[in-house]
Amino acid sequence: QGTSVAAARRLSDFTMPRDVSAYASDNAAKLAAIQALYAAQSGRPGRWRELGDSGSATFRCMDVFPAASRLYLSDRASWSAGYDTMALGTGRDLREVAKAIYARESGDQRVQAFTFRVDNGGYDTHSDQGGADPAGQHWTLHAEVGAALKHFFDDLADMGGGLDQRVTVVAWSEFSRRVRQNDSGTDHGSQGPMFVVGGGVNGGIYGNHPNIAASDLGSDGNTRYRQGAHDFRSTDVRDVFGTVLVRWLGIPESEVLDPVSGLLRLDDGAADTRWTAADFDLRRGADGATLFRA
């Protein structure tokens, strides 16, 4: 079964459509009546209760997030304008994240969102990838992400409270590009880089660079996971997300690694399941007191 979620492009859009006709004066009464219908289901069993709880949660979001948007736009107008100046979708999406963080840091405990996802598309560059050309497709996409992230972290730093130290961004793609060129582009790859950004990150390069020598590529032009006894996988995506779950979000490692119900499989020694670094730790320092959740 799927899970339905309420979604809006911008926090300010998180509201119920209002009647703008001659009956607009009834809007408040209509909203109150709908809220009452959802609230009445909270004491009922099964799906009725789930429906009521979901509806009530949606109305709470309608109170919280548009207010968070207004607060940010009022207090941080110049920073908001900076996102617009970039004219980049990624920047404008990160501004919505900044709004929620700022509201929480300003004391609105109703904001309970601690993880966010922002998409940046266009990387399926089978053609016209552009190489090292600053006007090329691939270069432009990376420049967009870089500019947006810089402004976002500068915004957080200016908010105070060490937010630029406490907020962490993981940038990754569900597929990468292969080494062998396909005319003017590249096809889907077997491995790719991830970036972890934030003041709390123990910076550096984790894992070995994959072997990209032409003689060591597979017949399809992809890097290999293994060649004989040599492991080319370098770093497992689970190393990165496992570290974030445990060291930033404070989820007990036993829950993350539980072999039956955990989020990630335990290392059983097999090449296709093991973590590549048992002590993989991106986080600077030992305590979790600086988590954004705190």
Task: Identify the meaning behind each predicted range.
Residues Q1-G146, D154-M159, Y206-P210, A214-A294:
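Feature for exported/extracytoplasmic and membrane-associated proteins, marking the mature portion
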Residues Q109-A113, D164-Q165, G189:
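Short gly/pro-enriched beta-turn/loop segments at secondary-structure junctions
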Residues F114-R117, T168-A171, P193-V196:
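Structural recognition of the beta-strand scaffold that forms the well-ordered cores
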Residues L149, F153-D183:
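Metal-dependent active-site segment of extracytoplasmic phospho-/sulfohydrolases and closely related
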Residues S173-Y206:
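Histidine-centered active-site microenvironments of extracellular/periplasmic hydrolases
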